[in-house]
Amino acid sequence: MVLGSAALFVLSLCVTELTLHAADTCPEVKVLDLEGSNKLTILQGCPGLPGALGPKGEAGAKGDRGESGLPGHPGKAGPTGPKGDRGEKGVRGEKGDTGPSQSCATGPRTCKELLTRGYFLTGWYTIYLPDCRPLTVLCDMDTDGGGWTVFQRRIDGTVDFFRDWTSYKQGFGSQLGEFWLGNDNIHALTTQGTNELRVDLADFDGNHDFAKYSSFQIQGEAEKYKLILGNFLGGGAGDSLTSQNNMLFSTKDQDNDQGSSNCAVRYHGAWWYSDCHTSNLNGLYLRGLHKSYANGVNWKSWKGYNYSYKVSEMKVRLI
């Protein structure tokens, strides 16, 4: 059916009115050619309201795992946890070989060396023997220039010096009082170079004197700690040791003297007895004058055989 001109005009007006009325919300208008000059304008309506949400679909199959991402920055450390229980004690390992001693390599060998290092106080120090064995010794840093290693001291009679061979070999006594350093130690000390000897004595009236020798050494146990003594250099106490030079050491249980009887037993000491002695500094502590003969702390050349000294110290110093 072909619309007349009047009808088309009316329809055009209606469409235009509708288009103007809805221009604010649905502006899209399409014009289609019909035939010739007759055109039909078609208005596209506004979209309708969204429909209701459909039901949720089923989950798809699990995909392949993706590649790991870059590591993140480390987080802050958390608070320290409580201390755990102590574990069981492990098995003790085998004892290793003894390594070289740094102290032996650089440590002092004598009291004189300690003095040169700036140790000026008399007292007990650790030195190192030639075999690297540490030894605690009394260093006299005051007498005659200092640097003396004391190996015998008698001061009050609190220590028994009438002892056997093993005791004199190992040493005995107290750092606080009287002692014998031990023949093995004295041997080790006196075989490292030349050592001078000083004997200091004091009586019970406050008098002090000494005797000094150019060298002093004792040999090892195999040689019965034989005494090798140098020349007497002087001192008001006189020389009461030269007669013991080249003698072997004797104790109450090992008689190595040149007498017919055991001088150590006879004179209650231990010494380098010949037949028998002119000194007995390891004898009985008899406190001054005594009626018994030559069995005290005796040094004949100063006060004879019937006087036992209050103080006796024997000491060596490396020359």
Swiss-Prot record:
**Keyword Disulfide bond included in the entry's annotation:** yes
Q: Which domain of life is it from?
A: Eukaryota
Keyword annotations from UniProtKB, A to Z: Calcium, Collagen, Complement activation lectin pathway, Disulfide bond, Glycoprotein, Immunity, Innate immunity, Lectin, Metal-binding, Repeat, Secreted, Signal
A single GO cellular-component term from the record reads:
serine-type endopeptidase complex
List the Pfam families hit by this protein, alphabetically: Collagen (PF01391), Fibrinogen_C (PF00147)
Residue spans of biased composition, Basic and acidic residues class: 83-97
The UniProt annotation places Ca(2+) binding at: D255, D257, S261
Q: Which residues are glycosylated?
A: N306
Keyword Iron-sulfur tagged: no
Where's the Fibrinogen C-terminal domain? Answer: 102-319
Which InterPro entries has this protein been placed in?
Collagen, Fibrinogen-like_C, Fibrinogen_a/b/g_C_1, Fibrinogen_a/b/g_C_dom, Fibrinogen_C-term_domain, Fibrinogen_CS
Q: Which residues form the Collagen-like domain?
A: 45-101
Q: GO terms for molecular function, please?
A: antigen binding; carbohydrate binding; carbohydrate derivative binding; G protein-coupled receptor binding; metal ion binding; pattern recognition receptor activity; sialic acid binding; signaling receptor binding
Q: Where is this region: Disordered?
A: 53-106
- Annotated compartments: Secreted
Instruction: List the disulfide bonds in this chain.
Output: C104-C132, C111-C139, C263-C276
Q: Which GO terms describe its biological process?
A: cell surface pattern recognition receptor signaling pathway; complement activation, lectin pathway; G protein-coupled receptor signaling pathway; host-mediated suppression of symbiont invasion; positive regulation of interleukin-8 production; positive regulation of opsonization; protein localization to cell surface; proteolysis
Q: Where is the signal peptide?
A: 1-22
Major site of localization recorded for this protein: secreted
Q: What note about domains is in the entry?
A: The fibrinogen-like domain (FBG) contains calcium-binding sites that may be involved in carbohydrate binding.
Assembly and binders:
Homotrimer. Interacts with elastin. Interacts with MASP1 and MASP2.
Query: What does this gene product do?
Result: May function in innate immunity through activation of the lectin complement pathway. Calcium-dependent and GlcNAc-binding lectin.
Recorded family membership:
Belongs to the ficolin lectin family.
| Name by which UniProt lists this protein | Ficolin-2
What organism is recorded for this protein? Rattus norvegicus
The primary gene name is Fcn2
